[in-house]
Amino acid sequence: MDDSLGSAETTPRELVHFVTQQTRFALINNILQHPKQLPSMYEPEELNPRVSEATVYKHIQKLIDAVIVKEVALDDGQRRQGYPWKFYRLSEDGREFLEEHNLLAAEETLQQIYDTISDKPEKMVKYENAPRPDDI
């Protein structure tokens, strides 16, 4: 296991248990489902209506702290009013860890399911199509 993942005392088994906690694993799946694998905070909040916004934020932050997820932001000059400017993706180490532990097997299926969601709120579609750091 890469020493940068989790903490120095975290074993791979403990990290698998950590990422497969129901809410955190749903959030990882939301990242994988996103067309650019780079959702804003709003999109996972919308896709998990039974989970409070505060809980989504808390678990995203835990995934960031464990180096599974990385927060990326648009530069000040690239930001647009009314659009998100912070986004979340799997870190390189996080993706590698998930692949090593066979936790990305459904990635393509998740993207296909996401593509079939027909009743996305207007705001979600707007945010989904917002400029991302890789677009600019």
Task: Identify what each model region corresponds to.
Residues 2-29:
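Short alpha-helical segments that sit at the start of domains
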Residues 16-23, 74-100:
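Short, cationic-aromatic polyanion-contact patches
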Residues 31-35:
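Short helix-to-turn junction characteristic of helix-turn-helix DNA-binding domains
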Residues 36-47:
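Short acidic, hydrophobic short linear motifs in intrinsically disordered regions
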Residues 51-57:
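Short coil turns linking two alpha-helices in DNA-binding domains
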Residues 57-64, 79:
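Short, hydrophobic-biased segments on the C-terminal half of alpha helices
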Residues 64-76:
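A short, conserved structural fragment
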Residues 93-136:
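Amphipathic alpha-helical dimerization/coiled-coil segments
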